Amino acid sequence: MEKIFIEIGSCDFDTLNHFANEGWSGFIIDPMKKYLNNIPRKEGVQYLPIAIDHVKGERIIHYAEDNIVGKDKDFAGMSTFIPLNERNWGFRNVEGGKIDLLSGEMLIQTDTFRNVIRDYSIERIDFLKIDTEGYDFEILKSFPWDNVLLRPKIIKVEHFHVVNGMSEITKYLEDRSYHVYAEVHDLYA
């Protein structure tokens, strides 16, 4: 039986794309077309230029512009729904205030987790990876947990940019009978 992955939040340097080399099929979901289009295409992998959200529609995303990425490659592909006044990361303190390192804004397409699963006839998920710079827990909570057959076998979710992320996400996953292992930036369940 073929294995299925879903990766929400990607870039062009740290993806699950290589799983296709081992016979997996999957979905790489990221609204930043500039980086999504740089990922080499693999048979059996769908590349969706959207963001997962609570509703289908459009939304402003904040991202690191090229001048920031040119100085610090760690910001390549970094984007978030969370505005500067609601986050404690992604800025540099300067005299008199803050410089937002995610100052670019773009209107992007959104869709729900449930819609993507329905539209692409996804019947199982072997590996779910979520890395969305602070919106990770919201996406995890939007998963259709009522469908027991879809329950991901393995989950990797970033907690680093979520306020109280490690404890809240750990409890949420444990409440769904997962065993959770924590690393500095990510949780595995």
What are these regions (language model features)?
Residues M1-A189:
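Phosphate/nucleotide-binding beta-alpha loop and adjacent structural elements of enzyme active sites
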